[in-house]
Amino acid sequence: MKNKEKLRPFDEPLFCAIGKHRPEIMEDFTRVLLNDDSIKFKDSAVNIIPASITPDNKQTAEFIAYTKNDTVICFITDSQNEEEMINKVKWYRASRIKEYAGEDLDSIQSMILVILMEKDAFGYERPFYVMDSKLEYSDKTVIFRYKQIYVNSEYGFDDPLGDYIHDFMCDDIDDMRIDSIKEAVKYFESIGE
């Protein structure tokens, strides 16, 4: 992130930079999102995949963390409408999940795919939407079940989740609500990342 560029997750992903340098912030965001204080990331079990282009020429970015109970939590961004979003998630799911688990999906206890949405794609004004999903392999009898959580970045309430969503979307350090994110962004700017 350069000083003159806006710190928005759909341009240069702030949550990826935070995940790389300050994974404890993303760990706390995950606890707030899932309402589960027991969430703990494994040490050095964080993977940042730089912004990439999907088959429909849209940019996405990824942050992957592994919890101590072997849950994989993947964060991606999306600024598209619902239909394009669903198509991208299908592409992402097919191209990435097997890569994390190798040939053995049993090595993953569970998986949560968190999609940070620029708009409220479903239109119900909720902070997030949870869907149960599954991945089936036609050549095997394997069915891998996981959760998809669509986070509504237009959610503007003054609660812990709203504070995180606000700061991930914010391009003004002085307007950020969470001190640890402010400090992280100031650090990123000081090193020119």
Model region roles, listed by residue range:
Residues 1-193:
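Elongated, amphipathic alpha-helical interaction scaffolds
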